[in-house]
Amino acid sequence: MPKRVVAGIVTSDKMSKTRRVEIARLVKHPKYKKYIRRRTVCHVHDENNESGVGDKVEIIESEPLSKLKRWRLVRVLEKSTAVDVVALRAARKNAEAEGLAAAHAGEPETESAATDA
């Protein structure tokens, strides 16, 4: 069976010789027929530490290199700029904040708010 080759965006370069790459795809909902964004996160072996956060990279499936790493970096397709990285981090923070706000929306009122009323 041939090895899969896919493209994705580097989301983390904090580990030596390892990158976290996010592969985005669209999936059609079976009932509502709406396209939904899904993502897969892969840990990728980057022998020369060539890639950085925000870079678009091409990766290939490989034999297991560690507990999580099953992919190798083929090449960097597009280097990111500092502006791209800042925008990526800001978008991630906004998504986390919205997720927390939605989680807290269903919680009952606190004691201090109940006694003030």
From Swiss-Prot:
Keywords of the record: Ribonucleoprotein, Ribosomal protein, RNA-binding, rRNA-binding
Keyword RNA-binding: yes
Residues covered by region (Disordered): 97-117
Ribonucleoprotein recorded as keyword: yes
Pfam families noted in UniProt: Ribosomal_S17
CDD domains tied to this protein: Ribosomal_uS17
Origin superkingdom: Bacteria
Cellular component GO terms held in the UniProt record: cytosolic small ribosomal subunit
InterPro entries from the UniProt entry: NA-bd_OB-fold (IPR012340), Ribosomal_uS17 (IPR000266), Ribosomal_uS17_bact/chlr (IPR019984)
One biological process term in Gene Ontology: translation
GO terms assigned for molecular function: rRNA binding; structural constituent of ribosome
Protein task: One of the primary rRNA binding proteins, it binds specifically to the 5'-end of 16S ribosomal RNA.
Family statement drawn from the similarity comment of this UniProt entry: Belongs to the universal ribosomal protein uS17 family.
Subunit structure: Part of the 30S ribosomal subunit.
Protein name: Small ribosomal subunit protein uS17
Organism: Rhodopirellula baltica (strain DSM 10527 / NCIMB 13988 / SH1)
